[in-house]
Curated annotation (Swiss-Prot):
Keywords: Cell membrane, Conjugation, Membrane, Plasmid, Transmembrane, Transmembrane helix. It is found in: Cell membrane. Belongs to the TrbD family. InterPro entries: Conjugal_tfr_TrbD (IPR016704), T4SS_VirB3/TrbD/AvhB (IPR007792). This is Conjugal transfer protein TrbD. One of its GO terms (cellular component) is plasma membrane. It is a single-pass membrane protein. The keyword Transmembrane helix applies. It comes from Rhizobium radiobacter. The chain crosses the membrane at residues 40-60. Its main location: membrane.
Amino acid sequence: MAESGSALVRSRVHRALSRPNLLMGADRELVLLTALAAIILIFVVLTWYAALFGIAIWLIVVGALRTMAKADPLMRRVYIRHISYKNFYRATSSPWRKF
């Protein structure tokens, strides 16, 4: 442990620089993408039923995204990385496991 009189250099890391980028408690890009899809549905169909359906679907998806972000705020990035590495790391064990 460093003593109070030591010459260690300390740097402040601001909380905003290390926090994940969330909007309404969910991943920002996914919330905006689902909002865009709901708005497109509402303005293309132009009925009250489409408006209610679009808002309901958006609220359900945002709830699911908030649950996902509560488990891991970076889950979208982890999943995209998992998909890109899927060819290199198989889900099966190696044939040399028994040795």
